[in-house]
Amino acid sequence: MSASIYLVKGREKSLLRRHPWIFSKGIERVQGNPIDGDTVEIYTQDGKWLARGAWSGSSQIRARVWTFDKEETVDLDFFIRRLKYAQESRDGLIKRQGLTGYRLCAAESDGLPGLTIDRYADFLVCQILSAGAEFQRDLITQALRTLYPECSIYERSDVAVRKKEGLKERTGVIYGETPTEPVVIEENGGVKILVDIRNGHKTGFYLDQRDNRQAAAKYTEGKRVLNCFCYTGGFGVYALKGGAKEVVNVDLSQNALDIARQNAELNGLDTSNTQFVRHDVFKLLREYREKGDKFDVIVLDPPKFAESKAQLLGACRGYKDINMLAFQLLAPGGVLLTYSCSGLMEQSLFQKIVADAALDAGRDAQILELLSQASDHPIGTAYPEGFYLKGLVVRAR
C-alpha cells in the first residue's frame, strides 16, 4: 500500500491550480514510511484526494506531482504516454525548422517533474534531477527504448541540484553507444552545430536559444559583432550567415572556442574576419573600453548568475555591470542582444537592470524585441518557474 501525505489546511490551493510542487511546510502529516522516489497519494487535510506524486525526503520540495488524475497509475504506460505526447507536440516545430536537435522533455512543463531530455541526432541525453525521476529511471529508460529504438541514451545528471534531492551526480551511457566525438545537429533550415554531449555545458548545447540565434542574424549585415560568453559559437555562426563584416567570439574555454571555429567552418563560412578570443569577458570589455573600441552589435549570453534567492542581489549587480560595459562599447545606433537564463530573475527586473545600465552608461536606448526560450522549452501555465530565459534586443542612440 502506498504512503499518503496530508496537507496543512489551505496549502491545497496551489494543487487545485495544478502547480506540481508540495513544499515541506505544506505537509501536516505523512501516513506510512515512503522512501525517496516512492509514489505517494496526496490529500487535503480533511481527506480529499488531490494528486499522486513522488516523495523526496531530502528536498524542501517534499513531493512532485506525477498526475492529477486519480485513475492514472505511474507505470511504464504512463511514461510512454507522456513522452509520446511531448514528441507529438514538437513534431510540427521539428518539421518547420528542420531540427535534428531539440528538447524532447521539459520536466515539469511536460508533466514529468525532474526529467529533462534533449535529442541530438540519434542520441537522447537525459538529466534526472529529482528523487522521483531517479526512482523511475528504469521505467523511463524502457519508455525511451520503446519509442526510440534507433537511439542511444546518455545521462548527464552532473548537476548540483541533485544534492538537494539527496542524490549524487552521475554521467554515462544508459543504453547503446558512447558519443565519443561531437555530434552534428541541424537547426533553422540547415545550420549545422557540433554538440559535445559528454563534456559540453548542460546536455551539450543551448537548444533554448535557437530562435534567438536566428533573430540575431538580421542585425549583423555589414556590422562589427562582439559575441560574449560565446561557448561553441552559435550566435557567431548566425552573425556570419547574416553578413557580419567582423565577429569576435569570446569565451574562457579553449575547447569551446575550438568547437566554435569548427562550427563556422562546418557551415562553409569564411573565418578570415573572425576572432576566437580566450579571455574573461568582464576584463576584456574593460580593456576594450580603455582602448576606445566600438562594436555595432554585442551579444551578452552569460551563464546563470543566480542559483538561489540568496544570490539574486549579487546577480543583479553582475548583470548591471556587464550590460553597462556593453552600452559603453556600442557605436551610435548599435544593438545589444542581452540575456538572462536565471529563473529567479523576473522579466520586469531584468528589463529594469538593463534600463539602469543604459542610464549609467549615459546612453538613451530603445527596446526593439522581447525574447524568450524556444517553443520546445514550453512554459506550463500552472508552472511559471518554467519561464527562465529572458532576452532583450536594445538599440542605443
UniProtKB/Swiss-Prot annotation:
PROSITE patterns: PUA. SUPFAM superfamilies: PUA domain-like, S-adenosyl-L-methionine-dependent methyltransferases. Transmembrane segments: none annotated. Residues 2-79 form the PUA domain. The keyword S-adenosyl-L-methionine applies. CDD domains: AdoMet_MTases, PUA_RlmI, RlmI_M_like. This is Ribosomal RNA large subunit methyltransferase I. It comes from Aeromonas hydrophila subsp. hydrophila (strain ATCC 7966 / DSM 30187 / BCRC 13018 / CCUG 14551 / JCM 1027 / KCTC 2358 / NCIMB 9240 / NCTC 8049).
